[in-house]
């Protein structure tokens, strides 16, 4: 960390950054192959910078659902330009997409939670399973503060369904922490954030949030807040005890 950058951070955030760098390095060393699932939104651009600027051996991929905003897809180019890194993209199986559209309609996800989750499974979960088929661990940019569905998030977990470790290194970071980091390190960010989109998913399923709403209120806004997950993180998860998490950063 440069002196100029260090002075731009509060002591508390500087300590979080130091711990984050140490944790990512240890994750990369601990497992033969690790991948980071990036949505190309703010938290994930933070982790992209932390990984690539330090040369941590963690691969980065994104799920190109076929229905992302142009601004989100543009972040792949910005990462290439800034870091010289090509983010790996995983796409849904076209035959599964075609069957869903033929049976239910292109935008059937508005009709019920079941049809929405089915669409998410085809466009996100199945590609994620392929992306993680050959890894020992994966990393996410999830934070506890984001929504009620993530309030119990642990920094280190065991993804029992896939038989691999799962890390959420930003679990205890606040939104203010994230944006202070992005500003201090001049990290490129999705322009949709400036238009009121703190959480960004597929274009037809994401809207800008209103004052006072939580950061994920714009995702699947027509549903109850308790159902707002796409299935990427809804698997059998075993939290790692807090003392083990603390040890992982040393």
Swiss-Prot record:
Gene Ontology CC terms, in alphabetical order: cytoplasm
Pathway: Sulfur metabolism; hydrogen sulfide biosynthesis; sulfite from sulfate
Active-site residue numbers: 230
Biological process terms in GO annotation: cysteine biosynthetic process; hydrogen sulfide biosynthetic process; sulfate assimilation, phosphoadenylyl sulfate reduction by phosphoadenylyl-sulfate reductase (thioredoxin)
Signal peptide: none
Stored Gene3D superfamilies: HUPs
Molecular function terms, GO-annotated: 4 iron, 4 sulfur cluster binding; adenylyl-sulfate reductase (thioredoxin) activity; metal ion binding; phosphoadenylyl-sulfate reductase (thioredoxin) activity
Keywords: Cytoplasm, Iron, Iron-sulfur, Metal-binding, Oxidoreductase
InterPro entries (alphabetical): APS_reductase, PAPS/APS_Rdtase, PAPS_reduct_dom, Rossmann-like_a/b/a_fold
SUPFAM superfamilies attached to this UniProt entry: Adenine nucleotide alpha hydrolases-like
Protein's cellular compartments: Cytoplasm
Residues forming coiled coils: none
Positions bound to [4Fe-4S] cluster: 119-120, 202, 205
Alphabetized Pfam families for the sequence: PAPS_reduct
UniProt EC number: 1.8.4.10
Cofactor: [4Fe-4S] cluster
Cofactor note: Binds 1 [4Fe-4S] cluster per subunit.
Catalytic activity: [thioredoxin]-disulfide + sulfite + AMP + 2 H(+) = adenosine 5'-phosphosulfate + [thioredoxin]-dithiol
Principal subcellular localisation of the protein: cytoplasm
Similarity-based family: Belongs to the PAPS reductase family. CysH subfamily.
Function: Catalyzes the formation of sulfite from adenosine 5'-phosphosulfate (APS) using thioredoxin as an electron donor.
NCBIfam families linked to this entry: APS_reductase (TIGR02055), PRK02090.1 (NF002537)
Protein name (database record): Adenosine 5'-phosphosulfate reductase
Species whose genome carries this gene: Burkholderia cepacia (Pseudomonas cepacia)
Gene expressing this chain: cysH
């Amino acid at each position: 960390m440069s002196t100029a950058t260090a002075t731009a951070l509060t002591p508390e955030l500087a300590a979080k950054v130091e711990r984050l760098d140490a944790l990512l390095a240890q994750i990369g060393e601990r497992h033969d192959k690790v991948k980071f699932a990036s949505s190309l939104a703010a938290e994930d651009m933070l982790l992209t910078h932390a990984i690539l600027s330090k040369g941590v051996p963690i691969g980065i991929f994104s799920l190109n659902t076929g229905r992302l905003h142009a601004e989100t897809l543009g972040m792949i180019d910005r990462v290439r330009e800034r870091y010289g890194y090509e983010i790996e993209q995983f796409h849904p199986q076209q035959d599964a997409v075609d069957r869903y559209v033929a049976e239910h309609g292109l935008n059937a996800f508005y009709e019920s939670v079941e049809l929405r989750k089915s669409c998410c499974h085809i466009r996100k979960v199945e590609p994620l399973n392929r992306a993680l088929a050959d890894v020992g661990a994966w990393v996410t940019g999830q934070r506890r503060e984001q929504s009620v569905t993530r309030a119990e998030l642990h920094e280190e977990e065991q993804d029992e369904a896939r038989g691999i470790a799962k890390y959420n290194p930003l679990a205890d970071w606040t939104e203010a922490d994230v944006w202070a980091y992005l500003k201090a390190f001049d990290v490129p960010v999705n322009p949709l954030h400036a238009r009121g989109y703190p959480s960004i998913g597929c274009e037809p399923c994401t809207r800008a949030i209103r004052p006072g709403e939580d950061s994920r209120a714009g995702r699947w806004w027509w549903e109850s807040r308790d159902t707002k997950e796409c299935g990427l993180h809804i698997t059998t998860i075993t939290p790692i005890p807090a003392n083990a998490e603390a040890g992982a950063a040393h």
